[in-house]
Amino acid sequence: MSPVPLKNAEPAHGGVRTVSVLGATGSIGDSTMDLIRAEPERYQVEALTGNANVAGLAKLAKEFSARFVAVADPARLGELRAALAGTDVACGAGESAVIEAAARPADWVMAAISGAAGLKPALAAVDRGTTVALANKECLVCAGDFFMSRATAAGAQILPADSEHNALFQALASGNRHELTRVIITASGGPFRTWAAADIEQATLAQALKHPNWSMGQKITIDSASMMNKGLEVIEASYLFALSPDEIDVLVHPQSIVHGLVEFADRSVVAQLGAPDMRIPIAHCLGFPDRITGRAAKLDLAKIGQLTFEAPDFTRFPGLRLAYDALRTGNGATTVYNAANEVAVAAFIAQKIRFGAIARLVEDTLNSWVRAGNQAPLGSADDAIALDQQARNLAATLLPQIAAKAS
């Protein structure tokens, strides 16, 4: 018998796996479809959804013989029907159709609709008790306790599809909950990692969009520059793995090769490494509990040469500190944190505020909301969506005075 404890079992999913991809025309959806495209004999596409890219959605539906597709924009239904004419693909439009797509019978669902619009469809998939690969931050940041309780009640399995939480998910398998001492989420540090605070304050949009490692959308790239994205990931990790804020650390790692680490009681630290390519965590989710053939480049540590680490600076990047504050406040504070940040980032993109004012608007919104005494547990998706809108309105009200201070 080999002393190496490697499994030699038959694949857990030997047959064809039915899959649905919510947000199929976005960046996460594109990576997911790329993996499915590589091994089409393993998958049957049940449902696909998109926001407004009808041509892209119809093209995917035809390529993968999807059974149902939905476009979020109800005004695009006629266009979608025309694009699918002559096929057997059923289609719909609007929120109800997207939720219908999520609730259809599939073994595996990728929940990659961005924003609060992704919450109800993800819940529809969860309620079926299926396996859900979660790439929507709002499900956890805005409704974490409620979302995870609902998943547990339905018997659904939640697989984290983003790189950091997927890394933690893999590393956590090395031990038991009572043996865990902390998890460590890594951050690239973004384009302003070495900048002085005064320079960060005045950073331009073009500078904020120059991420050193990842190719991402505009909003998440700005969040990386402010380290708000890492704050959101701390919040997600807390809900996803039932961890206290004190059990979650952040470590700046400029090379973005080590994505997450877990420390156990015996002081062993287990880490997951990989190239900065979203197809790696998505492939882990798509094959789980088996491993499928990846599409990303192999990791060449000799070529990379060195891996470096440093502590985060909570003074130059206050958005990270605010995430911990929101977690400790609870009762909807993380929802407010996320909503205020979205308003602030939109204002920065529109050149209404300086980069440094993003965190100030988030902090002022949180403080104002706490002073109003409106904190309460969120008991439903509608509660989370209502608080999200309330927080956006509050942030918008505070925005002019933040902008005036910066001028």
Curated annotation (Swiss-Prot):
Known cofactor(s): Mg(2+); Mn(2+)
Residue numbers binding NADPH: 25-28, 53, 136, 138, 217
Keyword Oxidoreductase: yes
The EC number(s) this enzyme carries: 1.1.1.267
Originating organism: Rhodopseudomonas palustris (strain ATCC BAA-98 / CGA009)
Family to which this protein belongs: Belongs to the DXR family.
PANTHER family: 1-DEOXY-D-XYLULOSE 5-PHOSPHATE REDUCTOISOMERASE, 1-DEOXY-D-XYLULOSE 5-PHOSPHATE REDUCTOISOMERASE, CHLOROPLASTIC
Pathway(s) annotated for this protein in UniProt: Isoprenoid biosynthesis; isopentenyl diphosphate biosynthesis via DXP pathway; isopentenyl diphosphate from 1-deoxy-D-xylulose 5-phosphate: step 1/6
Binding site residues for 1-deoxy-D-xylulose 5-phosphate: 137, 163-164, 188, 211, 224, 229-230, 233
Segments crossing the lipid bilayer: none
This protein's record includes keyword Secreted: no
Name under which the protein is recorded: 1-deoxy-D-xylulose 5-phosphate reductoisomerase
Pfam families: DXP_redisom_C, DXP_reductoisom, DXPR_C
Function comment: Catalyzes the NADPH-dependent rearrangement and reduction of 1-deoxy-D-xylulose-5-phosphate (DXP) to 2-C-methyl-D-erythritol 4-phosphate (MEP).
Gene name per UniProt: dxr
Disulfide partners: none
GO molecular function, one term: 1-deoxy-D-xylulose-5-phosphate reductoisomerase activity
